[in-house]
Structure formats: C-alpha cells, structure tokens
C-alpha cells in the first residue's frame, strides 16, 4: 500500500485531533501524525487527490510532499 506524506499546518493537539477525525471518517487508512514537524503520513489505497481533499476538510493549509 502506498504511503503518502502531507504537510498540514497543525499548531496544537486539537488540530491533530481534527486530522484524525476526518481520516477515520474516510476509512481504509493507516496514518501517523507528526505534530512537531506538521506532517501526516498516510498509508492507503485512496488516491492522493482524495486524501488531500479529505485533509483540507480540517480547514488547515495542506500540501502534498510526495510518496514516503
């Protein structure tokens, strides 16, 4: 399963919780949230576009960094 890395402008635990919420709702993902470095690594069969759109639902600035 591909691992995608995203930069997400998270500043606190609440931001990380919002990311967890939208990813859990999407389903079919395994993820790691690196709050200090503002990165989210997602292992999923979903397309990068789907994952990016899902992360943007948090209202945070999100950018795709590439495959890990």
From Swiss-Prot:
- One of the protein's GO biological processes: copper ion export
Q: Which residues cross the membrane?
A: none
> Which keywords appear in this protein's UniProt record, sorted alphabetically?
Acetylation, Chaperone, Copper, Copper transport, Ion transport, Metal-binding, Phosphoprotein, Transport
The tissues in which it is expressed are:
Ubiquitous.
The family database entries (InterPro entries) matched by this protein are listed as: Copper_transport_ATOX1-like, Heavy-metal-associated_CS, HMA_dom, HMA_dom_sf
Positions contributing to Cu cation binding: 12, 15
Phosphoserine found at = 47
Task: Locate the N6-acetyllysine modifications and list their residues.
Answer: 60
Family annotation (PROSITE patterns): HMA_1, HMA_2
Give the HMA domain ranges: 1-63
* A Pfam family annotated for this UniProt entry: HMA
One MF term in the entry's GO annotations:
ATPase binding
Q: What does this protein do?
A: Binds and deliver cytosolic copper to the copper ATPase proteins. May be important in cellular antioxidant defense.
Describe its assembly.
Homodimer. Interacts with ATP7B. Interacts with ATP7A. Interacts (via dimer form) with SLC31A1 (via C-terminal domain); this interaction improves ATOX1 stability and controls intracellular Cu(I) levels.
Q: What is this protein called?
A: Copper transport protein ATOX1
The lineage, from the top, is: Eukaryota, Metazoa, Chordata, Craniata, Vertebrata
Q: What would be the name of the gene that encodes this protein? A: ATOX1
């Amino acid at each position: 399963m591909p691992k995608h890395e995203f930069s997400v402008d998270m500043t606190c635990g609440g931001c990380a919780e919002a990311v967890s919420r939208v990813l859990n709702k999407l389903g079919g993902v395994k993820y790691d949230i690196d709050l200090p470095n503002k990165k989210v690594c997602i292992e999923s069969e979903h397309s990068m576009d789907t994952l990016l759109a899902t992360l943007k639902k948090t209202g945070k600035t999100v950018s795709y960094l590439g495959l890990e």
